[in-house]
């Protein structure tokens, strides 16, 4: 679904799938995606961070003479992100000159109000503390549940080697 949707949108120069699996590569190609290389197994473990995968992908594509300023990461766990939200995320990235935009939605779970964790003495305390008490969810700072869809400024990513810098914005979507 994600491949078809991305191709149908006509918003991208290339729709590329990065994988280490030849079967997945064959399936991706059959839907119209490009798979110009297979990802190394070392970047396909459960313990591998997305920053490492994205850095490898950007460097590999640049070495293959692909030219792009923005990389849109639409992970297989986010197949139903709407094309309008993809376009909105890209526009927000360009307009604000932030480092990345992540599709996200406001969540009712809030570490300032109704989420707790164990302290050193094994008693519960709020996950995030504020200088003043939060008396209701409505007065707590808004927090976002991130999705696995991001629009990333390539130059900034290469400079910082990570997606989540201090200049990341949410593109709010419906949960």
Regions found by a protein language model. Give the residues of each.
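N-terminal glycine-rich phosphate-binding loop and ensuing alpha1 helix
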Residues: 1-18
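Buried hydrophobic packing segments
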Residues: 6, 54-57, 157
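Residue-level signal for alpha-helix termini/capping positions
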Residues: 7, 62-63, 94
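Short, high-confidence coil segments that cap the C-terminus of an alpha-helix
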Residues: 12, 66-68, 95-98
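Conserved beta-strand segments of alpha/beta enzyme cores
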Residues: 14, 34-35, 167-169
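Structural beta-sheet core signal
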Residues: 17, 73, 100-102
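Short phosphate-binding loop-to-helix
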Residues: 22-72, 80-81, 88
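Conserved core of the sugar-phosphate nucleotidyltransferase
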Residues: 52, 79-167, 172
